[in-house]
Amino acid sequence: MNDRPAEETTIGEAAPAEIAEARPAHIGEPAPAEIAEARPAQIGEPASAAARPDLLADRLPYRIARPYRVRFEEATANESMRTAIYLAWAADIAWQHSTELGFGREWYAERGLFWLVRAIQLDVLRPIPTYAGMLVSTQVLGYRRVAARRESDVRDPSGELAARLLIDWVMTNERGIPTRVPADFLKFVAADTPAIEMHKVALPAAPRDAFERRFHVRRRDLDPLDHVNNSVYVDFLEEALEGAGQGDLLRATPRRYALDFAASAARGESLTGRAWPQDGGWAYRLSREDGTEVFRARVCRL
C-alpha cells in the first residue's frame, strides 16, 4: 500500500477534487448506501414519538439500523464503552449495509476494489454503560469522484442520540490507487446531494515537551488485511492522552475526535506517538521511526 503525502486541509475545509495517492487506511469493508444532509450532533438529542420509528427502522436502500450490545471486554474501568468500539460498530454496519445492497466481499474481490477509511469525525455525546443495548444506523451522505462519506448514529432504544460519526472513505484498486466510484452506486444517491468536503487534520510540529510514547505494533492490533485496524489507532491516541494526564478529557461528554489516517502501520513496526495541548484540546501525531506520519488526531470538549 502506498503512503500518501500529508495534505494541509483541516476538518471542514475543501479537499482537492481528487486524491493524488492512496490513503492506506484500515477497514477493507465497503462503504455506501443512503443520503441525508450532514447535521451537527446535538447533545442528548431526543427523538420525538413520531420520529422514533423512522430513526430506528431501516429505510432501504438508503439506510439500515442494527442492534449492538456493549460487551464486558469492550468497556473501560469506569464502566463505559471504549471509544474505539464506536469505530468498530460503524465499520461493521457499513459492511452489512453494502452486502444487503448486493455489494458483498465477493463483488469487491472480483473487481479488485476496496474501501479504505480516510478520516473520521466522532462526537461522543454521552457515555454508554457496560452491557447496554444500542441501535447503530448507517447511510451515505454523498460521493466525490473517488470517495464517499457515511454517517452513523448510535442511539439508545428510545431513539436518544449518544454518538455520531462522519466517516470519509476512499475507493482504491488492488494496487492501492484511488479509483472512481462505480456508477452502480450512484443510484443510491439523491440528485440534490451536496458536495462533500473531505475531512483533514493539519497539525503543527510537536513541541519539545510533548508527551512521547514509543511502542511496537502487536499481533492483536492487526486486522484481516494484516495492518493496524483503524479503531486501534483510537486506543493508541487515548493511551497517550491518559499518559499525559488527560483522563478527565477522555471521560468528558460531549467531546469530539477528529481522526486522520495518513498511512497504514504494519505488523511489528516501531511507532512513536506524541501528544500535546492545542487550541483548548489535545493534538496527537503517530509516526514511524523515519518520521513518516501514520495518524493525526485532535480531541476536544464540545
Model-derived features with residue positions:
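Small beta-barrel nucleic-acid-binding modules, principally OB-folds
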Residues: G112-P127, A252-S264
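HotDog/MaoC-like acyl-thioester-processing domains
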Residues: N2-R4, G44-S48, P53-L55, L60-R66, ...
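Hot-dog-fold acyl-thioester-processing enzymes
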Residues: N2-P5, G44-V117, R164-L166, T172-R255
